[in-house]
Design a protein with these regions (language model features):
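N-terminal, post-signal peptide beta-strand-biased segments of exported outer-membrane/organellar beta-barrel
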Residues: 15-118, 122, 131, 142, ...
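Residues that define the transmembrane beta-barrel architecture of outer-membrane proteins
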Residues: 43, 84-90, 150-154, 263-267, ...
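Residue-level signature of outer-membrane beta-barrel architecture
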Residues: 53, 94-98, 160, 269, ...
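Transmembrane beta-barrel strands of outer-membrane/channel proteins
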Residues: 61-69, 105-109, 170-174, 283-287, ...
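Repeated loop/turn-to-beta-strand initiation elements of outer-membrane beta-barrel proteins
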Residues: 100-103, 165-168, 278-281, 346-349, ...
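Solvent-exposed loop segments that connect transmembrane elements
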Residues: 119-141, 180-257, 293-324, 361-374, ...
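Detector for outer-membrane/organellar transmembrane beta-barrel domains
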Residues: 270-274, 278-294, 324-408
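Outer-membrane beta-barrel "beta-signal"
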Residues: 430-432, 438, 469-483
Length: 483
């Protein structure tokens, strides 16, 4: 396991997720054809394990490599923040086919998101419009946020042939996940005259009450008490003026470096029914994986107790990253069904439908800044895909597909660290059959995401929502070798 986890230095999955966290790009072959569940081929260890026993007897080794390039953007009013994405993703699978079925093993990315670095975020931009911050005249002096979510999975299982048509599979899954948040808050402050006046009045009232309480029953005259109040008030106002001057000159700063980590375990069930030489039907169920993430690291919050009544940091807005917290974020169960049909000896079509049980999973159910609830408003997600494979000759096969996905994420779940957008994916590729035992597949996919708005208007009472967009293109290369 430790050796496999060394691969995570270059493995970051979920770059083009079809659901909240989950991906389906377990292999580069998926980029070319996103309708894999009903097919039987060299990548069935990922998509249709129950069908592996229908392959020719032998040992199969599959290795793949994907590279994704693109960008993600968030904006609020006239301020836009953009993060570039460049990420590599490897995968590996081993399959041993015998007369009774097949034993399979695979390792690769399962869920999460690529590493993104923003030079500011909309969650900071909106603070200038909030009533509790407006009089302070706060503004961003150069805050930054970097986040990454990575999940790796090992699957080990067995496929059993019942007869020449029906087969099923069962497997165990081990999942490791890390979710990181690293950022700095650099906030400028330019208090308004109204703030200074109201704060001075507040200080004077607090001093007066404190002196009254301290001198009660001491036998002091009214003049003596008044003199004490004047002295204490002047001292407090001088201290306030010094604090305001410091805020104006230096602003406020804070940072966080939080790493959440968890292990989870699950199972996988599959069934395959070969109707005839042309039509194949299959289904796969991946169980929910319970993951209890514990956060480690450090955080320094903005020292704002004297001006706001509390300290504020990035964990105020993203409490799931609070140091030493332990919060559930499960991977939802998946049900995938698919079919493939060989129209001619050279032309095969396939289709799939995936259903994500998001509503049954606990995903970062926390209370954020302003007593707003997060993680309780996910709907179930789904996607459909159609694929085509046309054999040009004995050596080359053209591949193409289209996918439509709805993640199930409501706009109330969107924030700077997480926004799962609905998408359309166009994929294509070519497979080169070097000989009967070696196939090489080159693939490409372009992910077209539907831009969406968040819920700042509802959440904070401002006049405009934040907006999210992203665009990603991925290329891949895989090799499948039969021994």
């Amino acid at each position: 396991m430790k050796k496999l986890l060394l691969l995570t230095a270059i493995l970051s999955s979920g770059l083009y997720a079809a659901s909240i966290d989950h991906i389906q790009t377990y292999s580069p072959d998926y980029l070319a054809n996103q309708a894999q569940t009903g097919m039987i081929n060299g990548v069935s260890a990922y998509y249709n394990p129950a069908g592996l026993g229908r392959l020719e007897k032998g040992k199969y080794f599959h290795v793949g490599f994907q590279f994704a390039h693109g960008h993600e953007k968030m904006s609020y009013k006239e301020k836009e923040h953009k993060a570039k994405l460049n990420q590599a993703i490897p995968n590996i699978a081993l399959t041993f086919v015998d007369n009774k079925g097949a034993t399979f093993f695979n390792f690769g990315g399962l869920a999460g998101g690529g590493k993104l670095q923003y030079d500011g975020v909309s969650g900071v931009d909106v603070l200038t419009d909030l009533a509790q911050f407006k009089l302070l005249g706060i503004y961003d002096k150069g805050s930054s946020l970097t986040g990454s979510n990575k999940y790796e999975q090992i699957t080990l299982g067995r496929a059993f042939n019942i007869d020449d048509k029906l087969s099923f599979s069962i497997a165990g899954r081990v999942v490791h996940g890390t979710r990181k948040l690293n950022g700095s808050l650099n906030i400028g402050v330019n208090p308004t005259a109204q703030y200074r006046q109201e704060k001075a009045q507040q200080v004077a009232q607090e001093v007066s009450r404190a002196v009254d309480a301290a001198t009660q029953g001491k036998g002091l005259s009214a003049a003596q008490i008044a003199a004490i109040k004047t002295q204490k008030t002047n001292e407090a106002l001088a201290k306030l003026q010094k604090r305001v001057t410091d805020l104006t000159q230096n602003g406020l700063s804070g940072d966080i470096d939080s790493k959440r980590e968890a292990w989870g375990y699950g199972f996988q069930l599959g069934i395959n029914y070969r109707v005839n030489d042309k039509l194949n039907l299959a289904a796969r169920y991946d169980s929910r994986v319970k993951m209890n993430f514990k956060a480690k690291g450090h955080e320094y919050q903005l020292q704002t107790t004297d001006i706001l009544g509390q300290t504020i940091g990035l964990s105020t807005f993203y409490p799931q990253y609070t140091i030493n917290s332990k919060i559930r974020r499960d991977l939802p169960a998946i049900l995938s069904v698919g079919a493939s049909y060989k129209i001619t000896d050279n032309y095969l079509v396939s289709g799939i439908g995936n259903f994500y049980f998001n509503h049954q999973a606990k995903m970062d159910r926390v209370t954020t800044f302003g007593e707003h609830q997060h993680g309780r408003d996910y709907k179930n997600g789904w996607e459909i895909a159609i694929g085509n494979e046309y054999k040009l000759n004995d050596k080359f096969t053209l591949i193409g597909s289209v996918n439509y996905a709805r993640t199930g994420a409501k706009n109330s779940s969107f924030n700077d660290t997480e926004y799962a957008l609905n998408s359309v994916t166009l994929g294509g590729g070519i497979r080169y059959q070097y000989d009967e035992s070696l196939a090489i597949t080159a693939s490409v996919a372009h992910f077209i995401y539907k831009g969406a708005e968040g819920n700042f208007k509802e959440k904070y009472g401002v006049t405009e929502n934040q907006k999210y967009k992203k665009e990603i293109t991925a290329v891949g290369l895989s090799i499948t070798k039969k021994f």
